[in-house]
């Protein structure tokens, strides 16, 4: 990567094909908004894709802070702009076509996303800095439930990873300075109560 105008903010290595996804930001020096994009490199280091705009030419991202790939190939990113208060989960299909924005549950406060991952059911799990919980949404952007609502030792969930073999959710806590594991799916791929 040799472009000096764009700064890499996050990286993700796809277990599907070994591609490297990089979340990028161009910080505007004027009063205009920051711009973001996701670029994809194949296993030989060749740039193969840039995802930046929706089908109307509107920018999809401002600051791509966290990125993951769902089982169906969708690219899932936490996007935010703390200057303006904008924050959302942005999902595109593998080819780059915009699918949806998720900004929080219908009856709750707006999401302030941080860490993000997906599980064996293709659910999207995202840390919410506003509620200090991990939100679970469907692969189509519908809110399912909150996980880990202020459990002991987890003061501010900040980063996530899902272990697909052991079905464990790894959660890093910013304020608690801990990394913890949680099981919410049993080994038979059912939800635990």
Language model regions located:
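Eukaryotic scaffold repeat domains enriched in small/polar residues
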Residues: 1-193
């Amino acid at each position: 990567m040799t472009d000096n105008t764009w700064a890499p903010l996050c990286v993700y290595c796809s277990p599907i094909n070994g591609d490297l996804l990089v979340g990028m930001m161009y910080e505007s020096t004027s009063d205009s908004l920051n711009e973001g994009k996701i670029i994809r490199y194949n296993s030989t280091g060749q740039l193969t894709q840039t995802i930046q705009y929706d089908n109307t030419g509107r920018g999809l991202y401002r600051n791509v802070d966290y990125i993951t790939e769902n089982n169906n190939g969708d690219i899932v990113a936490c996007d935010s702009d703390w200057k303006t208060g904008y924050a959302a989960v942005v999902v595109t299909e593998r080819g780059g076509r915009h699918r949806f924005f998720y900004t929080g549950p219908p009856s709750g406060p707006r999401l302030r996303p941080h860490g993000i991952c997906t599980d064996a059911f293709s659910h999207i799990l995202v840390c919410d800095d506003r509620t200090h919980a991990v939100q679970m949404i469907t692969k189509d952007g519908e809110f399912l439930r909150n996980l880990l609502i202020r459990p002991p030792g987890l003061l501010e969930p900040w980063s996530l990873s899902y272990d697909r073999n052991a079905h464990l959710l790894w959660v890093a806590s910013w304020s608690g300075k801990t990394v913890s594991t949680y099981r919410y799916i049993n080994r038979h791929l059912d939800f635990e109560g």
